[in-house]
Amino acid sequence: MQIPEPLALISHALRYEKSEAVFRTGDPADAVYRVLAGEVHLLRRAPDGADIVIHRARTGDFFAEASLFSPRYHCDAICVRPCRCLRLPAGALRQAIANEPSFAMEWITALSRNLRRQRSAQERLALKGTRARVVHYLVDCGESGCVTLDQPLIRWAEELGVSHEALYRALSAMEKEGVLARDGTTLRLLARSNGI
């Protein structure tokens, strides 16, 4: 996405360390961010104090766009590894959307893509069983059932909503059955059946 020049001139690339907050719940919502490198999780707190990951922003993704018209952020944005993020001031971003039709269309396209990805993740989490979630991920997020993971298996398990032990067992069983091939971080679905 090409950022219009007036917005680009006042946007800044910022560096963050692993576990550093980009913003916290209740902070003034004065910017939207784009991940240039790394990964940022948007977190809310459950009543028991546990973190709930509501969004995973990876390289190229925007985050905090839901707060573009809000006075305050509704979640914490925490870097899960060292990150570089582009900070787009909210007022200037709103102005660019209003005044630059081609940018507005690109913005809407990016929001639509993100919404589809979030809906797909919700669909995946509604599936019963680890195998079903793995297959859904490979078919939905990969090309011809092949995905090269950009995260450790333990983090992928969190994204799938399963324990890492359950994920390891499912992957091992699928390999033994000839349903899945693994080569380092690349997973390829070899066959599909009603039993998956």
Model-predicted regions and their roles:
Residues 1-20, 57, 62-63, 67-70:
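Cyclic nucleotide-binding regulatory module and flanking cytosolic helices
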Residues 8-9, 27-29:
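Short, small/polar residue-rich loop motifs at catalytic or cofactor-binding pockets
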Residues 15-16, 34, 44, 79, ...:
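Conserved hydrophobic "DFG−1" position in protein kinase catalytic cores
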Residues 21-27:
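Short phosphate-coordinating micro-motif centered on Lys-Gly-acidic
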Residues 30-43, 59-60:
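Glycine- and acidic-residue-biased ligand/ion/polar-headgroup-sensing regions
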Residues 53-109, 116:
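Cyclic-nucleotide recognition modules
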Residues 117-139:
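Short alpha-helical segments that sit at the start of domains
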Residues 130, 137-196:
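Phosphate-/nucleic-acid-contacting segments
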